[in-house]
């Protein structure tokens, strides 16, 4: 028995390796998607709401950016939920 109570001689099963690999892929995908979301929000909301950048935001610009970000986040969440739901259905159909 190993130091922490497990069998130190047992290598992870192929299912364990697959599970670990899939978890890593999901995490990397989530990070990439978050980066893409932030990039799109910056690109589109900034261009739309701040046509002439200055040293400070005026209240209208702040409000516009805030609303734009909320819309992007809402749309992103809807698309993500729909995609996940579809992937889960397809996974069930394969099994």
Curated annotation (Swiss-Prot):
This is Mitochondrial import inner membrane translocase subunit tim13. It is a peripheral membrane protein. Belongs to the small Tim family. Keywords: Chaperone, Disulfide bond, Membrane, Metal-binding, Mitochondrion, Mitochondrion inner membrane, Protein transport, Translocation, Transport, Zinc. It is found in: Mitochondrion inner membrane. It comes from the Eukaryota. GO terms for cellular component: cytosol; mitochondrial inner membrane; mitochondrial intermembrane space protein transporter complex; nucleus. Pfam families: zf-Tim10_DDP (PF02953). Mitochondrial intermembrane chaperone that participates in the import and insertion of some multi-pass transmembrane proteins into the mitochondrial inner membrane. Also required for the transfer of beta-barrel precursors from the TOM complex to the sorting and assembly machinery (SAM complex) of the outer membrane. Acts as a chaperone-like protein that protects the hydrophobic precursors from aggregation and guide them through the mitochondrial intermembrane space. Heterohexamer; composed of 3 copies of TIM8 and 3 copies of TIM13, named soluble 70 kDa complex. Associates with the TIM22 complex, whose core is composed of TIM22 and TIM54. Interacts with the transmembrane regions of multi-pass transmembrane proteins in transit. One of its GO terms (molecular function) is metal ion binding. A motif (Twin CX3C motif) lies at residues 45-68. InterPro entries: Tim10-like, Tim10-like_dom_sf. Coiled coil: none annotated. One of its GO terms (biological process) is protein insertion into mitochondrial inner membrane. The gene is tim13. Disulfide bonds join 45-68, 49-64. Transmembrane segments: none annotated. The twin CX3C motif contains 4 conserved Cys residues that form 2 disulfide bonds in the mitochondrial intermembrane space. However, during the transit of TIM13 from cytoplasm into mitochondrion, the Cys residues probably coordinate zinc, thereby preventing folding and allowing its transfer across mitochondrial outer membrane.
């Amino acid at each position: 028995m190993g130091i922490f109570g497990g069998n130190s001689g047992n290598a992870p099963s192929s299912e364990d390796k697959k599970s670990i690999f899939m978890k890593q892929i999901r995490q990397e995908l989530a990070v990439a998607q978050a980066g893409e979301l932030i990039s799109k929000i910056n690109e589109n909301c900034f261009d739309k709401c701040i046509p002439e950048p200055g040293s400070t935001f005026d209240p209208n610009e702040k409000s516009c950016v805030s609303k734009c970000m909320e819309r992007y986040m809402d749309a992103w969440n809807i698309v993500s939920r729909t995609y996940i739901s579809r992937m889960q259905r397809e996974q069930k159909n394969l099994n």
